[in-house]
């Protein structure tokens, strides 16, 4: 059995196969997932697992160099945004790099998900709790 934090085999496999600049989307329960993109559905019930729990599990195994977030989160979900930005700042410290954060419209965000290697669906039921993470290299 693995002894790292991330135990979900399909999610662990997706992260293990990411190359430099590949993207992985973590989303709330409502984001549309394109049929051609691999879906890692972790949602069990409303709020389980939360978006932030899912984010924290993913970044235990993924080196992140940049992120995209929907602009609308600033107004519609500031609590999640604040927690997410704090988590990204902590991740920068752990990784020893700067993580570029870009804001785009929600419509543009949905377009960008079409290029993701996979989309990880959480049980989060709050608006705009979504992020696209781009893989970096830890050297």
From Swiss-Prot:
UniProt pathway annotation: Carbohydrate metabolism; D-ribose degradation; D-ribose 5-phosphate from beta-D-ribopyranose: step 1/2
Membrane-crossing residue ranges in chain numbering: none
Enzyme class (EC, first level): isomerase
Claim: Cytoplasm is one of the keywords in the record: yes
GO MF entries: D-ribose pyranase activity; intramolecular lyase activity; monosaccharide binding
Source superkingdom: Bacteria
NCBIfam families: PRK11797.1 (NF008761)
Protein name: D-ribose pyranase
Organism expressing this protein natively: Pasteurella multocida (strain Pm70)
